[in-house]
A protein has these predicted regions:
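Terminal helix-turn-helix DNA-binding modules in bacterial transcription factors
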Residues: 168-205, 227-235
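Short, Lys/Arg-enriched N-terminal segment that forms or immediately precedes the first helix
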Residues: 14-18, 117-124, 162-170
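Basic/polar phosphate-binding segments, predominantly the helix-turn-helix DNA-binding elements
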Residues: 148-177, 199-221
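Helix-turn-helix/homeodomain-like alpha-helical modules used for DNA recognition
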Residues: 1-3, 12-24, 207-228, 233-235
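Aromatic/histidine-rich interaction motifs
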Residues: 88-109
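Residues that scaffold the ATP/ADP-binding catalytic core of kinase and kinase-like folds
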Residues: 85-87, 176, 225
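A short, Lys/Arg-enriched amphipathic alpha-helix from helix-turn-helix/homeodomain DNA-binding modules
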Residues: 110-147, 151-154, 175-194
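N-terminal regulatory/effector-sensing and dimerization cores
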Residues: 2-91
Length: 235
C-alpha cells in the first residue's frame, strides 16, 4: 500500500511516497516525479524508465501509472488553481527534466520552497495565459457545482465556456468541476473528516461516488491510497 507524506497547497501538492498498487489514470494536474533511490517505471500512454536521480514531467490528461511497488518517489502536482493566469500544454509526451530542475525539486523542504519551485517551473515552461474571465472563478470555486453556475459567474454563454475551458484545460467544464470537487473532498479528508464528510464537502452524491471518482482521477481509493500518509496543509 501507499505510504509517505503529502504537503498540500492551493493548486499544488508535494508527495513523498513509497509506491503501492494503483491503476492507470490521468488528471487535470501536471505531475513531475523524481526517482529517489532506484529507477522509476512509468506505464500507460507511454512506457518509460526514469533513472534514479532523474525526474520526469507528465502533462495533464496523460494516462499513467507509477512503479515498481516499494520504490520511493517525490511527485509534484500543479494545476490551474496554483496560478490562475497560466496554463501548461496538456496531453504532451512525458519529458525528462534538466539537472537544474531536478535538483531544485529534490531540495524542497518547506511550503515556501515548494511554491517558489513551482513558480520557477511555470516561468521556464512558458506557460500560456488562461482566459481572464476564468481567473476569478478559479480563485474561489467553492460555490460552483454545475457548468451553468460556472458560466454565470464567468459571464459567459455555456457554449463559449465549453470552448474556453476545453482550450485552456483540455477538458469540458463538467470535468474541470469534478477535479475541483475532488480537491475539496480530499482537503476535508486531510482535515480529519470521514469519508461521508469528504463526500459532502466535494458535492458528491455519496461516499461510493467520491471513492469511484478518486480512483478515476488519482488511481487509488481514499482508504487504500491516502490513509497511510501524513498530511500538511500549506496556506
Amino acid at each position: 500500500s501507499w505510504s509517505g507524506s503529502i504537503m498540500l497547497g492551493t493548486g499544488w501538492a508535494l508527495i513523498d511516497a513509497r509506491i503501492g498498487s494503483s491503476r492507470p489514470h490521468n488528471h487535470v494536474a501536471h505531475q513531475i516525479s523524481l526517482a529517489i533511490e532506484r529507477d522509476l517505471e512509468i506505464s500507460g500512454d507511454a512506457d518509460l524508465i526514469v533513472p534514479a536521480g532523474h525526474a520526469i514531467a507528465i502533462a495533464s490528461h496523460v494516462r499513467h501509472r507509477l512503479g515498481p511497488p516499494g520504490a520511493l518517489v517525490r511527485s509534484f502536482y500543479l494545476d490551474p488553481l496554483f496560478r490562475a493566469g497560466t496554463r501548461l500544454s496538456a496531453g504532451s509526451a512525458p519529458v525528462l527534466l534538466t539537472p537544474i530542475e531536478t535538483a531544485g525539486l529534490g531540495d524542497i523542504a518547506s511550503g515556501a520552497d515548494a511554491k517558489r519551485w513551482a513558480s520557477d517551473y511555470l516561468d521556464r515552461s512558458q506557460a500560456r495565459p488562461v482566459d481572464a474571465r476564468l481567473s476569478e472563478v478559479l480563485a474561489a470555486p467553492d460555490d460552483l457545482s454545475t457548468a451553468r453556475a460556472l458560466a454565470d459567474v464567468a459571464c459567459l454563454s455555456p457554449s463559449r465556456l465549453r470552448e474556453i475551458v476545453s482550450r485552456d484545460f483540455g477538458v469540458p467544464p463538467a470535468k474541470l468541476l469534478q477535479w475541483l470537487q475532488l480537491q475539496r473532498a480530499v482537503r476535508t479528508l486531510v482535515g480529519g473528516g470521514g469519508l461521508a464528510d469528504a463526500a459532502a464537502a466535494g458535492g458528491f452524491a455519496d461516499q461510493s461516488h467520491f471513492t469511484r471518482r478518486c480512483a478515476q482521477w488519482l488511481g487509488v481509493t481514499p482508504s487504500a491510497g491516502l490513509s497511510a500518509f501524513a498530511f500538511e496543509i500549506v496556506p
